[in-house]
Every structure is written in structure tokens, then in C-alpha cells.
């Protein structure tokens, strides 16, 4: 399940970041076509480092880190 903080690999062939790994910044639950915002370390030709993707265009590589328990 893709969720905030997950490391994901991009499967959209026309994307600048195709086969690259990025971090999920947020997942929108409203039903839009591209609900997952992914942030990358490198920028594209326009200087942008985020993009929206559909859930089926992503493969989760690493689950998000668990938050430490509060005392």
C-alpha cells in the first residue's frame, strides 16, 4: 500500500523519472486521476522535483519508517 513516506519506483514511461525512486509526499483520497504526489532528489529540465502519479504507475520499494512511540 502506497502511503506517505513510502519509497516508490516510477512505471510511467513518458515520465522524466521513469524507473527512478522517489518519496511519496501525500496521497489524495478525493478520487482524482493522479492522487499520489512523489518528491524526487533530482530536478527535471524545468527545475521541478515533484509530480503527481496514479497508484498503478508506482511500485512500493520501501515502506515508510515507523514513528517512535510517544511516552
Swiss-Prot record:
Mode of membrane association: Peripheral membrane protein
Principal subcellular localization: membrane
Record key words, sorted: Membrane, Photosynthesis, Photosystem I, Thylakoid
Keyword Nucleotide-binding assigned: no
Keyword Membrane carried by entry: yes
Gene Ontology CC entries for this record: photosystem I reaction center; plasma membrane-derived thylakoid membrane
Domain of life per record: Bacteria
Subcellular location: Cellular thylakoid membrane
Entry's Gene Ontology BP terms: photosynthesis
Function per UniProt: Stabilizes the interaction between PsaC and the PSI core, assists the docking of the ferredoxin to PSI and interacts with ferredoxin-NADP oxidoreductase.
HAMAP family noted in UniProt: PSI_PsaE
UniProt xrefs under NCBIfam families: PRK02749.1
Recorded family membership: Belongs to the PsaE family.
Protein name per UniProt: Photosystem I reaction center subunit IV
UniProt organism field: Trichormus variabilis (strain ATCC 29413 / PCC 7937) (Anabaena variabilis)
Amino acid at each position: 500500500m502506497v502511503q506517505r513516506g513510502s519509497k516508490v519506483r516510477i512505471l510511467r514511461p513518458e515520465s522524466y523519472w521513469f524507473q527512478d525512486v522517489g518519496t511519496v509526499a501525500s496521497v489524495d483520497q478525493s478520487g482524482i486521476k493522479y492522487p499520489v504526489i512523489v518528491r524526487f532528489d533530482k530536478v527535471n529540465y524545468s527545475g521541478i522535483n515533484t509530480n503527481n502519479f496514479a497508484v498503478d504507475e508506482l511500485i512500493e520499494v520501501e515502506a515508510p519508517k515507523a514513528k517512535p512511540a510517544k511516552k
